[in-house]
Design a protein with these regions (language model features):
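Extracytoplasmic electrostatic interaction patches
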Residues: 93-210
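C-terminal motif of bacterial Sec signal peptides marking the signal peptidase cleavage site
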Residues: 18-21
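Short N-terminal edge-element motif at the start of the domain
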Residues: 24-85
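Hydrophobic helical h-region of N-terminal Sec-dependent signal peptides
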Residues: 11-15
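Bacterial N-terminal signal peptides that target proteins for export
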Residues: 2-9
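Compositionally biased, intrinsically disordered/low-complexity regions enriched for serine, proline
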Residues: 3, 24, 162-164
Length: 210
């Protein structure tokens, strides 16, 4: 039975003080300017999420503070097909704000949450100073048979460069007896991921244009 409490809903509840309704003081408190980085949950928050089956193995929370020129954030869930990344949806999900720079919030900052669902689909939710966004779960593979699974989530602060995709998650599944650990940088060299039954990636891209 699929959970009825997706990660983003729980994080909004458990991090209510940190989010501060997306005020200028939060949720960017942990992210330095021009970076995206893991959001450090305290033990109480981890325990609460774990009670709903959300752990560091299947969920991710990141805080970000985009460059001053950024007006949009795009999120893409891709699947490796014949050595090439293919978007699993008809379009790239994203949101932002347009208009003169002086009319926008002082900073584009927020919290991004990712959850791997039981059918292998991926859900993303963003709360930010530009507003909120949630995608329809993408990349479902309910009939996939696998015996091995490996994941790589963003674990270190990453500098944001406009219009350059940043891989934040790689998830691989196979039916063999062993599987090598994943490296996020393999997103840029997909040939390193050959031989796996299913590989999915999540990237985020900050842009000056919607």
């Amino acid at each position: 039975m699929k959970r009825t409490h997706p990660l983003w809903m729980l994080l909004v509840l458990t991090l209510a003080l940190a989010l501060g309704a997306c005020s200028d003081q939060a949720p960017a408190a942990q992210a330095q300017e021009n970076t995206i980085a893991p959001y450090e949950l305290n033990q109480q928050e981890r325990d609460l999420l774990s009670a709903f089956g959300l752990t560091e193995d299947n969920a991710l929370a990141l805080s970000f503070q985009a460059p001053a020129e950024a007006k949009a954030l795009f999120i893409q869930v891709s699947r490796l097909e014949d050595g090439v990344w293919e978007n699993v949806a008809d379009s790239v999900s994203g949101f932002g704000m347009d208009g003169p720079q002086e009319d926008l919030p002082d900073s584009f900052a927020g919290l991004l949450c990712l959850e791997e669902n039981v059918d292998r689909s991926l859900s993303v939710h963003v709360q930010s100073t530009f507003g909120g966004f949630a995608n329809t779960p993408q990349g479902a593979a309910p009939d996939l048979e696998w015996t091995m699974r490996s994941t790589a989530f963003l674990q270190e602060t990453q500098t944001i460069q406009l219009d350059q995709p940043i891989p934040i998650a790689l998830l691989a599944y196979g039916t063999g007896t062993s599987m090598s650990s994943l490296d996020l940088q393999s997103y840029f060299t997909p040939e390193d991921l050959a031989g796996l039954d299913l590989v999915q990636a999540v990237t985020v891209t900050f842009s000056e244009t919607l």
